[in-house]
Amino acid sequence: MASLNTQIIAYLTVNNITYTPGDYQTGQPEGQSDQILSWNTEKLGAEPTQAQLDEAYPIWEGQQIQAQNKTTAVSLLSATDWTCTIDIADIQYSNPYLTNQADFLTYRSAVRAIAVNPPTTPAVFPTEPTEQWSS
């Protein structure tokens, strides 16, 4: 289970509420569970209920995973950009030349699909092809 502070950050983020440190404070009074000790209602609105925190957390968690999936996909695409240049697989321009450019194009298409529409669950990325060069 996520900490109360993480649940609050999730609630504020999902509801597009801008906050700064000090707008709320959590803590554990002696012998009690973690709770909200102070809440800036003028800036943040009404203090959220546990039900609101519970509802926001999985949405926020999905958004975090989605953002990570997109970041990973963009990085993988960037790392293989060189495979798409016209000269890399053309004997007229390059010797040696890449003989399996089609494998890279297929790979990049699958990765691009994740980058364009990142899932909210951890993505399964395809395996990058191994470069094969003419001899």
What kind of feature is each model-predicted range?
Residues M1-S135:
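A preference for well-ordered globular domain cores
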